[in-house]
Every structure is written in C-alpha cells, then in structure tokens.
Amino acid sequence: MKNYIEIVDVYARQILDSRCNPTVEVEVELEDGTVGVAAVPSGASTGAFEAVELRDGDKSKYLGKGVLKAVDNVNTIIADELVGMNVLDQVAIDKTMIELDGTDNKAKLGANAMLGVSLACAKAAANSLGMSLYQYIGGVNGKVLPVPMMNIINGGKHADNNVDLQEFMIMPAGAPSFSEALRMCSEVYHALKSTLKAQGYDTGVGDEGGFAPNLKSNEEAIVVIIEAIKKAGYTPGEDIFIALDPASSEIFEDGKYNLAGEGRVLTPEEMANYYVELAEKYPIISIEDGMAEEDWDGWKILTEKIGNKVQLVGDDLFVTNTERLSKGIKLGVANSILIKLNQIGTLTETLNAIEMAERAGYTAVVSHRSGETEDTTIADLVVAVNAGQIKTGAPARSERVAKYNQLLRIEEELNDMGEYRGLKAFYNINK
C-alpha cells in the first residue's frame, strides 16, 4: 500500500444546500489524478459554542448568506499550505488548517471552509487507495450499521407551526437489520401521513422531511406517532421506540423554559419532571438537548432523574467539542453526545470527540444538519466508528434519503461482517 500520495490541487466553490442557502463544496486532487469531493452542511438551530460558519454578510446577495469568503480562504490560504502534503496524513492536514486559522472557534478561515477540505482529503485518500470511505476511516473494525433516529414530526425552528419541541423521532431498535429498520420507518412514515390526513391535519413537511402539523400540544405529537406505529403493524416500545429533540436552548428565557404553544413556563426542575412524566407514559428511549446549553444545573437534575433509563444526548451542550464534553463528563451530565462534523470543523477533532465519549461510557449519535446536501460522508462515518446510531431526517427529501441509501450499500458490502445492534446500541441505560 502507498504511504505517500501528494495533494496537487485544492479547490472550492459555492453551491446550494437543501434550504436554498449557499454552502461550500471542495475538490481535492491528488498526484495520481484521483479526486475527492465534499460538501458542507449548515444548521438552523445552532449552539452558541459551535465553530464559526463564515458567511459574507452582503445583503444584496443571498440575503447575506453567501460563502465566497470561505471559498476564497480555501482557494488561497489553505490551498497554498496543503498542496504538496501527504493526503494520507489526515492529522497533519487538519492540524495545519487549525494552526493557519489560529482562533479558538475557526473564525478566521471558517469551519465551513476547513471541514470541506478535511472531508475532501479523506475522500480523495480513500478513492486513491480503492477503499470505501468507512473502511479508510475505520479500518477493519468499522462494521456496525446504525439504528436510525428518524425525525417524522417537526416543530420549533424546523417548522412553521405551534409545536414547541423541535423533533419527534422514531428508532426501530427492535429491527433485525438496518435494511429492515429502514423499511419499518418508511412504513410508519406513510402510516403517519394517512393518520394526520384522516384527522384533518396538514401533511406539509419541514426542513428534515418530517411532517409539520399544527397539533394541539407536544404530547399530541407523541400520541399520533404511536398511533402510526400501531397502524403500520408494529409494537411501540418493542419494535419501535420514540426519541425527542426539544432543542431546549431555543425555548430557554430568563432561566425558565417557555412552552409557548401550550401556554406554560417551567423551571428547570419542572421541565425535568415534564420529561419524567413523558418517559413514564410513553416508550421514549432518547431525549436530545432536554435542557439548554448553559443550564448545567438543569442537565444535572435531568440526568439524576432519568439518566439510567433514557439516553440523554448533548448537542448544543457539547457541540462535538472535547472541552465541553470533558466538562460534562466531570459533572456527570447527559450520557450521550451528538456528533455534527461542522460544529467542530475537522475530521480529526470529530474522531477525538467520539473517542472521548466512548471512553467515558457515553454513546455517540452521528448527525446531519437541517441544511444538508447530497454528500453522504456521515453514513460512512457512523459505520467507521461503530457509533451504532445515526440521525439524518425522515425517509423523504433526497438529501436525507441519500444517507440511508449509502448505508444500504454499505450493509450490502459488509454482508455477513456487518452488525446491527438494535437495543444493544443503548448500552449505558436500562431498557
């Protein structure tokens, strides 16, 4: 196997994401003519501690959301340093960009510029070696197909409705394989659409392909999903479980949680009890961002109450950042981390966060963003690191389905070597 393959060109362009906003796409060319291409996603509800996504701010073009500055940074500053480097040395590539940027949050070059380059380099390396991306990143050990965490009802910032909690999801942890899990979710999605229609609700979809009806309460979203699970012929809490992403930082005001759609304002203790009641009443296996990103006390309360039986995922809380995660581990808050590549900005730092989480007994959930592209890197990443769970939207909208289809290909390629862990993916809670 080759041990040095030179980078000969690094080039970026501005493309569109699934929300009609510009984003960065990068091509990396190698001495043997191989090319790797990667496109960068973007979030709607972003954590305050995420790495900086560089936008142009020119209101006359794309409402100020252009990324030509980030593109230029790739084509000049970053390209000048990386051309001539060994594409197989991912750590050196990412370290070089981090040093070039010189800030704590990638504000100079932009995390969107750096991530595009980081991922394009990994893809170029894999292509040059004739390997799948998951094999290149994970080696011979990358073999676990993930349980989908599939968003089928949208609220909050992902939809224009009166539902406060941002995402209501299903997890087919009782499925025997990934392909069967995907089939189950697809059938529930269709059952949910017909159930909503029958009850007179709108079946328009949100950013991530989930439906966005004007339901009477957050709890009604859970009830209608359970009805759809049963209608599809499955057993809630056995075949398929419920997962929530309240995105609580978005409803946290003056130390309290404002459930405006329900006309309720709750203290952190009351909010924790709200989740406790839901978890006792319904088969909820995972809650993401149940508390706000700076409400460490609230997180502690929630973890002490249900952290032994519900997966508590830190997204805005941890932002794929080892410093934030280390603090959470020391304080004993949450028991899982959401992994979003663009929150931190390089593949190396992403892998470091996953490794830290797993060493501490935290699960890792690899995730998309609400503004996505046809790029399928996260499908390969989740298998490479054996994370066991992926969050990438409803089985609708091609930028979401692209990830699921890539996982079907990987499952086929792994054949008997592949493993779908189902409930075993939730190894740190009592189910």
UniProtKB/Swiss-Prot annotation:
Keywords recorded for this protein, A-Z: Cytoplasm, Glycolysis, Lyase, Magnesium, Metal-binding, Secreted
Keyword Mitochondrion: no
Required co-factors: Mg(2+)
Cofactor binding notes: Binds a second Mg(2+) ion via substrate during catalysis.
EC numbers on record: 4.2.1.11
GO molecular function, one term: phosphopyruvate hydratase activity
CC per GO annotation: cell surface; extracellular region; phosphopyruvate hydratase complex
Pfam family, one: Enolase_N
A Gene Ontology BP annotation from the UniProt entry: glycolytic process
Subcellular location: Cytoplasm; Secreted; Cell surface
Reactions accelerated catalytically: (2R)-2-phosphoglycerate = phosphoenolpyruvate + H2O
Principal cellular location given in the protein's record: cytoplasm
Family that this chain belongs to: Belongs to the enolase family.
Function: Catalyzes the reversible conversion of 2-phosphoglycerate (2-PG) into phosphoenolpyruvate (PEP). It is essential for the degradation of carbohydrates via glycolysis.
Protein name: Enolase
Taxonomic source organism: Clostridium botulinum (strain ATCC 19397 / Type A)
